């Protein structure tokens, strides 16, 4: 743990490196300046969560971050059970548990760093500032990523506030807004596009996106979910589950067992929005997968690999679709109900299905079941890393 604690010292030095602004300064020297207002939608776990509860058990944490920052690690070490009680949502309502009130941190501080030395949005903020952006022309639309998308509106009116902020920016700046989303933020934004137009949501009509949004910059958006999401809620796996640095991963893994971690992740319905979408049609089956390479012995379509502790030969593999079914068959009823009532992972095959799904909020995160907004002038830019090292097949060990 001491070695991990030393890591932020190097990060602090990196933060002050004058090259941090180099991209923005180069663009500025070429005549590039701020034009459209910018709204940033962070990804999963990257927004800090702070306590606003005043119950006697919460007063010690008042306005301290229980997710993100050093106060999170201190709280976890000092009183693990109390920390768990605060960060987990009510398993049946998906909202705040009794006498607990955690809210997303706001402003640029909400998602610039997860912990000292581990930057998330800070580099983008630095370079936006270098071409003239400031708090009047840029905004971080932080949200409580633990909530299901429907409950983001129920509890925090997140989508209503996002709509109002965009409209205000357009009115003041006389230019349409550019949206930049990361990871889960891409799904949140896709849901928002449906919500804002629908009569049961923002009721702004189909033309709203075209009238208010210049472009959407989708940075590593998990539009079809992510392979990491399933092992997280199934077994509490964290090694490549979330955007955490080595310190946070080591700290959480050291103080929380796998079962505890799985319980926590299941009690954060927002994380389950990133379960793989499209089933075997997208992710492959036992025989082949889109990302298989020539001569590969085992297809990446075999997503989960179960091995018996007592026999190296006894094993069975599961595709993504089978893995999702296994998850729902082996988890608690409250979790099954939450998943089925919040998200859809299927595929629509006809225009009639797609049109009908516009009236079903459960489908709004799924680009395989719903359409893009009716915005012919909207520009969409997608940024992804290519060929990063990864482990496509997850192994779960069992004695049964």
Q: What is each residue range found by the language model?
A:
Residues 1-180, 184-258, 262-265, 272-300, ...:
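N-terminal non-catalytic accessory region
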Residues 34, 267, 373-376:
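A generic structural signal for short, non-catalytic loop/turn and secondary-structure boundary residues
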Residues 306-400:
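C-terminal subdomain of alpha/beta-hydrolase-fold enzymes, centered on the catalytic histidine
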């Amino acid at each position: 743990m001491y070695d991990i604690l030393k890591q932020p010292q190097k990060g602090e030095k990196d933060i002050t490196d004058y090259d941090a602004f180099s991209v923005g300064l180069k663009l500025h020297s070429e005549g590039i300046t701020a034009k459209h207002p910018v709204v940033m939608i962070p990804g999963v776990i990257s927004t800090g969560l702070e306590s606003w509860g005043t119950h006697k058990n919460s007063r010690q944490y008042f306005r301290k971050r229980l997710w993100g920052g050093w106060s999170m690690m201190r709280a976890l070490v000092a009183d693990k059970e109390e920390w768990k009680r605060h960060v987990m949502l009510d398993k049946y309502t998906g909202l705040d548990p009794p006498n607990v009130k955690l809210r997303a941190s706001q402003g640029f501080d909400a998602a610039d760093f997860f912990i000292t030395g581990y930057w998330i949005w800070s580099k983008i903020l630095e370079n936006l500032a270098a071409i003239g952006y400031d708090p009047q022309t840029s905004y971080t639309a932080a949200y409580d990523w633990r909530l299901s998308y429907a409950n983001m509106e129920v509890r925090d009116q997140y989508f209503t506030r996002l709509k109002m902020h965009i409209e205000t920016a357009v009115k003041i700046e006389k230019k349409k807004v550019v949206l930049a989303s990361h990871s889960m933020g891409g799904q949140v934004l896709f849901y928002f596009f449906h919500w804002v137009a629908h009569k049961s949501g923002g009721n702004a009509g189909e033309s709203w996106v075209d009238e208010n949004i210049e472009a959407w910059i989708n940075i590593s958006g998990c539009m079809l979910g992510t392979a990491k999401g399933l092992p997280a809620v199934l077994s509490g796996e964290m090694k490549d589950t979330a955007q955490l640095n080595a310190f946070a991963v080591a700290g959480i893994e050291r103080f929380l067992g796998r079962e505890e971690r799985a319980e926590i992740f299941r009690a954060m319905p927002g994380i389950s929005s990133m379960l793989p979408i499209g089933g075997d049609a997208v992710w492959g089956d036992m025989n082949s997968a889109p990302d298989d390479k020539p001569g590969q012995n085992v297809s990446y379509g075999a997503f989960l690999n179960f091995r018996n502790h007592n026999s190296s030969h006894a094993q069975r593999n599961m595709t993504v679709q089978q893995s999702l079914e296994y998850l729902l068959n082996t988890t608690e009823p409250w979790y099954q109900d939450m998943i089925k009532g919040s998200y859809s992972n299927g595929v629509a095959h006809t225009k009639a299905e797609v049109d009908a799904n516009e009236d079903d909020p459960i489908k709004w995160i799924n680009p395989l079941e719903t359409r893009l907004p009716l915005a012919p002038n909207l520009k969409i830019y997608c940024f992804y890393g290519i060929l990063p090292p990864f482990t496509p097949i997850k192994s779960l060990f069992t004695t049964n």
